[in-house]
Amino acid sequence: MSLALKPAVVLERSTPMSGAVELVVHHPPAAAALRPGQFFQLAVAAPQTILRRPYSAAWADPDSGRIGFIFNVVGAGSGWLAVRHEGHELDLLGPLGRGFDLDGSKPAIIVAGGLGVAVFPGVVGALVARGRQVTVLLGARTSAQLLPSGRFPGAEVMTATDDGTAGYQGSVVDLMPVALGRFPPPQGEGRGGGPEIFACGPTPMLQALLEKSRRLGVPLGLIQVSLETPMGCGVGTCLGCAIARPGDGYLLTCLDGPCVRADRIDWSRTADAFHG
């Protein structure tokens, strides 16, 4: 369900990890409507910006009407957002798109590379609230860029850093065999057996995750990914976020995603469309 919203009011601004900003805004209708993994189109007033910018919500609290956004400063739009503070208003459109499918009872493995972690605090909270066993795999270049494990209460957290300053030294994808080894293996193709995997991160990480999962016998149907594609309108009009699906045809990230099961995507034809 998408909403044309009156402005949200910024309540807090913080830096949860190096290079990232977290804005907490107040908008009760949006907080109540949001499903984990959905996104908003935020209007920015930076110079030379015309289109709204898509940002996945990190979490929402319907009781207090609060929504959190975690993002890196990479351009004019995010730079403008990064200097908003308490009392500023933000023009939001959303929530938009499809969030993660959190139904079921399988154990869940979260694979978050870099700022891909931004979508997962609310996802993990919802999974834990459903009684599902959750293991969070966090990866970053260095320890200062890791979201604190305390943001995932009720889940086991494992970390990997490129420089070895926290946890395993190497890619977060390298933690997959350890995490998967704690559960019965998947039962062939489809979605039977084994844990379910939820992932978001840079393109190389997603590609490595899919290859590692294939070698470990994990069907693509057990993997859900949150896609980061170039997006214009966010409502299915501009077709700028199309990604190829198996066979003929395309999915639109803004309508069919951003959260999609990996077996619905033709990765050989769409790898260049993603950026993280």
Q: PLM features: what roles do these ranges have?
A:
Residues A45-T49, G94-G99, G247:
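Short, charged beta-turn/beta-strand-edge "cap" motif at the junction between a beta-strand
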Residues M1-L5, F183, G188-G192, D272-G276:
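Short, low-complexity, intrinsically disordered N-terminal peptides in bacterial proteins
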Residues A76-P184, R191-P230:
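FNR/FR-type flavoprotein reductase catalytic core
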Residues S2-E86:
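Ferredoxin-reductase
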